[in-house]
């Protein structure tokens, strides 16, 4: 497929697989993810779900098949219940509660004055970036679509929330086809296939072990990531 940001990109993800898209900013990762949701279509080529071109699938049907957790969690000024129920308007209250529990949101709900009926953004009630992400994950849990797209899903998670976000994502991903975009390379070592995008093209692909053995772009990315992580740990210890 081709677009203004992608050039001759071809990949195949089997049902139930976890695929990771990595690479420098501007490499085409988010563009590719948004094409799957038909935020826009490729100028050339096509995207298939099964054997069906997604342009031939009604948008409502396509949206039923895909859930997203994006970089910027978007919560509306409404109750937690209403924010989560956006993904499935007919959901019962008990379903929403179960989704929140699966998304590791119990601690959030317990501290809110009116529990899941608390209006976010009203009367000084605000959530941190990581807490908002967990509410967004609860939406995806409730929707339970077979395809899951995670775009920098832990980007705004503070240290206290990162472990909970990771656990929530692991629960959410069970039994689904997952397409994950991440800079935190430690989160994608278990991916069935990792695609390294650079300048709108797939520069390398393979599983973690195979890419490390190639000693190419991904290996350099991993070394840089590991060194940065070690520096952060050392800095925190000294502090």
PLM regions and their residue ranges:
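ABC-type nucleotide-binding domain
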Residues: 4-239
């Amino acid at each position: 497929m081709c677009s203004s940001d992608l050039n001759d990109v071809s990949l195949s993800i089997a049902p139930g697989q976890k695929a990771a898209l990595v690479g420098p900013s501007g490499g085409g990762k988010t563009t590719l993810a948004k094409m799957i949701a038909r935020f826009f279509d490729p100028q050339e080529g096509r995207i298939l779900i099964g054997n069906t071109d997604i342009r031939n699938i009604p948008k409502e049907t396509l949206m039923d098949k895909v859930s997203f957790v994006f970089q910027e969690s978007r919560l509306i000024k409404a109750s937690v219940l209403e924010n989560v129920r956006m993904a499935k308007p007919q959901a019962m209250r008990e379903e929403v509660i179960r989704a929140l529990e699966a998304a590791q949101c119990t601690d959030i709900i317990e501290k809110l004055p009116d529990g899941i009926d608390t209006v976010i953004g009203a009367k000084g009630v605000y959530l941190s970036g990581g807490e908002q992400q967990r509410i967004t994950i609860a939406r995806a849990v409730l929707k339970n679509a077979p395809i899951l797209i995670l775009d920098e899903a832990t980007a705004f998670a503070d240290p206290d929330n990162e472990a909970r976000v990771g656990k929530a994502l692991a629960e959410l991903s069970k039994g689904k086809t997952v397409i994950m975009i991440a800079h935190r390379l430690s989160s994608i070592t278990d991916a069935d296939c990792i695609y390294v995008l650079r300048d709108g093209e797939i520069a390398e692909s393979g599983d973690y072990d195979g890419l490390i053995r190639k000693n190419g772009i991904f290996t350099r990315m991993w070394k840089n990531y590991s060194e940065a992580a070690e520096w952060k740990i050392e800095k925190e210890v000294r502090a």
